[in-house]
Amino acid sequence: MNNDVFPNKFKAALAAKQVQIGCWSALSNPISTEVLGLAGFDWLVLDGEHAPNDISTFIPQLMALKGSASAPVVRVPTNEPVIIKRLLDIGFYNFLIPFVETKEEAEQAVASTRYPPEGIRGVSVSHRANMFGTVADYFAQSNKNITILVQIESQQGVDNVDAIAATEGVDGIFVGPSDLAAALGHLGNASHPDVQKTIQHIFNRASAHGKPSGILAPVEADARRYLEWGATFVAVGSDLGVFRSATQKLADTFKK
């Protein structure tokens, strides 16, 4: 049986520096995720760090995206090999790794997604990702079809951005603007000039190493500015944000 994920089109688009417009999925519900998958985004983040997701909620969301052109990207709760292994086995191919601060941490993230000898991923012969053992070339194809995006969101990460971006197997550098702002002493103010200057610096250093850069930017003016600065994979909003804004607007229309 063929696996319809290989080759990984999202990974190829990033490598080709094609602009990829995404959205954040935080509602942790297969219905809302399915709606996002119909909207036409290039990629969707299913959030395991700040949203109430786990293996049991991720699986129905992946099922809901079956046939969607939107590539599912999972943000793991932490850079931990066992967690990453379990997410690989249920069918994720694109990973967003939070709080990467050193080259060694970036290397660990890459190794966690690769079978030996390239990495340390544990081997199961039957799981959801290989259609329960029916994809004949899964082992041969898996290593080269996994996407690793690492988040820079601390001063140490900024200091080591060149080494992180140069790490083999890292496909892109993603800026976490809120945590970065906090780390730079501007909690709750990612628009501060110091934060914006640092974001642009990260984009530039990623580009210098031939790696695409990305960011979450729910404000349109911010998203367009980051695209002008060279970011190529930008999440332009979230299901939670859209839902919150739309319901408040609807209520205000009739209640005020």
Swiss-Prot record:
- What cofactor does this protein call for? Mg(2+)
Q: Where does substrate bind?
A: Q151, S178, D179
Instruction: Name the InterPro entries for this protein.
Output: Aldolase/citrate-lyase_domain, GarL, HpcH-HpaI_aldolase, Pyrv/PenolPyrv_kinase-like_dom, Pyrv_kinase-like_dom_sf
Keyword field: Lyase, Magnesium, Metal-binding
List, from the UniProt record, the residues annotated as the active site of this protein: H50
Superkingdom of the organism of origin: Bacteria
User: Residue numbers for the site described as Transition state stabilizer?
Assistant: R75
GO molecular function, a single term: magnesium ion binding
Q: What pathway does the UniProt record associate with this protein?
A: Carbohydrate acid metabolism; galactarate degradation; D-glycerate from galactarate: step 2/3
Q: Which residues hold Mg(2+)?
A: E153, D179
Q: What interactions and quaternary structure are annotated?
A: Homohexamer; trimer of dimers.
Which family does the entry's similarity section mention? Belongs to the HpcH/HpaI aldolase family. KDGluc aldolase subfamily.
Q: Which PANTHER family match?
A: 2-KETO-3-DEOXY-L-RHAMNONATE ALDOLASE, 5-KETO-4-DEOXY-D-GLUCARATE ALDOLASE
Q: What is this protein called?
A: 5-keto-4-deoxy-D-glucarate aldolase
Organism, as annotated: Escherichia coli O157:H7 (strain EC4115 / EHEC)
Lineage of producing organism: Bacteria, Pseudomonadati, Pseudomonadota, Gammaproteobacteria, Enterobacterales
